[in-house]
Amino acid sequence: MTDHDLMIKAFGSAPEGFSPLTSGDDSQRLQVKLGMTASVGGTTVDACCWADKTKPMQIITKALLFDPAIPDDDLRAMRESIFLVAVEVGRAT
C-alpha cells in the first residue's frame, strides 16, 4: 500500500467493451466476471479479470489501462490489490 488513497470496487458484471476469454472449456470458467475500478491519487484505471474455475489463483487480466503519470510503485499496488480482490471473490464462489 502506498501513501496514495487506493480504492478497489468490484462488481458482478464486466464493464462495457470487455469480454471474457473465449478459448478453452467454457464450463471450467468461473461464472463471476470481475470488473474493477482502481483510483489512485485521483487517477482512475479500469481492469477486468477472469479466474479459471479449477485454478482460482490464476487471475487472467483482460485489460489494464495505465496512466504514465502514476508512479510504478502505485501501479504495482493497484495490480496486487486487483489480484487479491479477484482471488477472494474467486474463493467465495
What are these regions (language model features)?
Residues 1-79, 84-93:
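Glycine-rich anion-binding surface patch
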